Amino acid sequence: MTLPLDGVRIIAIEQYGAGPFGTQHLADLGAEVIKIENPAEGGDVGRLVGPHFFEPGDSHFFQSFNRNKKSMTLDLKSPEGMEILRELAAQSDAVFNN
């Protein structure tokens, strides 16, 4: 079954609740959402919110707002990280930030 946003790529620089909730709907509608997480902070702070499935960091809260997404860590404070972000953005339909 084809979904309305099949073929749309969105780079999501987001964390916690509102941003991930919004892009979750876009992913559910078929968009390829690539979530960018900060490695220096351990990724999205939503990972720390309980309850946890099996161990700390495996948060039910995080999983529920980030289903159907791809995820990668990227240091946006480094020149290399910013270059990778620019390359991803050039190959995407939208960049989302909250």
Task: Report each predicted region and the residues it spans.
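N-terminal helix-loop segment corresponding to the beta1-alpha1 unit
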Residues: 1-98
